[in-house]
Structure formats: structure tokens, C-alpha cells
Amino acid sequence: MKAVTVIPLVKDSLALRDMPKPSPKRYQVLLSPIEVGVCGTDKDIIEGRYGAPPPGEEYLILGHESVAEVVELGDDVDNVSVGDIVVPTVRRPTTCTLPITEVDYCPRGTYAEHGIWYLHGFATEFAVTDSQYLVKVPKEAIDVAVLTEPLSIVEKGIDLALRLGKARFESWSPRRVLIMGAGPIGMLALMVMRLRDFADITVTATRPYDSLKAKLVREIGATYVNTNIDQINGDFDIVIEATGSTSAAYDALRHLGADGVAVLLGIYLDSKNVNIRPLLDDWRRNKLIIGATNASIGAFEMGVADLVKAKFEFGGWVRKLITKEVTLDEYEYAYNWGHEDIKSVIQIRSL
């Protein structure tokens, strides 16, 4: 079978290789991936920054964002059927003993992750995974279900922000929202906040006001600010940082008002020396800072439900977030996206 692979920690080893077709073991299923999303994590692995193959193997199959069809069941699988369309979660505990609903809190070194650490991913014609980590996709969301994995991170972060913000004091009533970044995470955060009935939302990026990103922000009722030209005005009750830039994360805290909640959703590899004085001020003004990376199956379920709602509320807007689609044979193009792109997807087979 064809598979998009790398030799982990070897820069630029990306290649389409012929790999043996796997067979499902007990409690596992064989999947036929339909679409696989591409993100910055994949780029980092391709650049040799991190990643690990399954034990005893040289190659790692990429792809942790996927929607797939169940095509074969291993023994004792009773929660899905052949023909079901599903989204697999990413993380699998190895020595971690937390329940399935909390595996996103497993300590580092106690888990494996599809397409990242010790488990093959889904950028291939066939893949196996544990059946209990699958979320069924209703037919009305199949064409956008590839967005579920990045959306799960957003769901987790926003859910934590709203619940923990309220837990501090019942009268907390956030209104103004700032989302920094108009990539896939930022746009999905905008979608979720609009579904949660937030009306005063500002999204910032560096693209022109006539760009696709700016148009999509305005299309569902938010304000777009090009930070190359204009400044962000005022304080916000909730700030969602989705750029992955250390300086932007630092800047996000400057725009957080008293009693506000900041949600950091980026992977911050560009470490820089920063003045911590503003952070000390945050504590004195009752600010709450939350980070979220991996998400549990509950957040995936929330994501699928919100994709269904968003298609009803916003029509074709959600699908417009997928700006680049390539075939498996054209895989290299998926990992080279420009500033105007939002989400790149490899279409493994037709829907």
C-alpha cells in the first residue's frame, strides 16, 4: 500500500513508500482513510525536529488528522461496524493509567501518538487503530470531518476557558473575544465562539483586508484586523492565541483585561527571552492563562457535533477553510502552503 513516510529525526526524508498492509488485532479496526489533514506538526517532523517510528521500524507514516471508513473489524469489536465513517483520536496510552476520557493529560513518555510518536499515522491507503478511540461521523459532516482533530484542540481550550472562568466567580460574563491568528486553529476558534453566541469577536492576522481569510472572518459576523496596518484596540475578556508565535503569545496577554482568560493553542518552538513583568501584573488582575495541545475523545465528539451545527448555521463556510486539496500521489504539495492557505488536505480516496 502507498504511504506518506519519513525517517524520524532525518531532515527531508519525506517520501511516498510502499508499506505492508496492516491487519487489525483484537479490539482494533482496519481503516480506509478518506482525507488526511496537514499541519505544522507534520512540517516539524519532516524537518527532523521530533517524532519516532513504531518500535523496531525505520519509517513513520505521517498523518494524525483523518476521516476514514471502517473496512474490517478485529475480534471483539462491538462499538463500530464495517462501513461506518469515523474520526480517530491521536493519542494512545502505553504506561499511562488515566481513563480514555483523560488521556490528553498523560505525562510525556507514557503514551504513543498516531503519525507522531511510535504509531503509524493515517496518510496511507490502510491503517489500524483501537476501536474505542473512534468517533462516528454523521453523513452531513463527512465532507468537513477532516477538520475534527484541530477542532478538538479548540474545543478543549474554549471549554476549559468558559468553565474555569466561571468557576472563579459565578457573575463572570465574558463578551469581548480576541482571536490572534487566522489559520485553521484561529478560524475554527472563531467558528466555535460564534456557535457559543459570542457576537463581539475580533480576529487578527497579517493578510490584507481583501484576502480570503479576512473575507471569511467577516462572512460570519466577526471583525478582522490586519496588524501590519492597524492596532488592536481595548481589552478583551477572552483572548485565544493561535499563531504559534512566542511574541504573539506574549502580546496576547497584553490585550487581556482584568478577570479575563487567555487560551494558548500554539506550539511555541521559537523561544525568546521575554520580560516577565506583564505576567506578574496578570496575577494581580485576576487573569487566567490556559494551554491546550492534545485533546481527549470527548473534545472530538464536541467537534463533530459543532461541525454539524456550523454547516447548518453557516452553510458552505466550513468547507471553505480547506483551501488546498491534493491526491496521495501529489502529497508533497500538501506540505507546502502559503500565507493565503488555511488548511491543506490529502485526499486518499473519494468520499
UniProtKB/Swiss-Prot annotation:
Please name the InterPro entries in this protein's record: ADH-like_N (IPR013154), Glc_1-DH_arc (IPR026583), Glu_dehyd_C (IPR031640), GroES-like_sf (IPR011032), NAD(P)-bd_dom_sf (IPR036291)
Which molecular-function annotations from GO does this UniProt entry contain? Answer: D-glucose binding; glucose 1-dehydrogenase (NAD+) activity; glucose 1-dehydrogenase (NADP+) activity; NAD+ binding; NADP+ binding; zinc ion binding
Q: Which UniProt keywords apply?
A: Carbohydrate metabolism, Metal-binding, NAD, NADP, Nucleotide-binding, Oxidoreductase, Zinc
Keyword NADP in annotation: yes
Species per Swiss-Prot/TrEMBL record: Vulcanisaeta moutnovskia (strain 768-28)
Protein name stated in the entry: Glucose 1-dehydrogenase 1
Family as reported in the entry's similarity comment? Belongs to the zinc-containing alcohol dehydrogenase family. Glucose 1-dehydrogenase subfamily.
Q: Where is NADP(+) annotated to bind?
A: 182-185, 265-267, 292-294
Give the EC number(s) under which this enzyme is classified.
Answer: 1.1.1.47
**SUPFAM superfamilies with a match to the protein in the record:** GroES-like, NAD(P)-binding Rossmann-fold domains
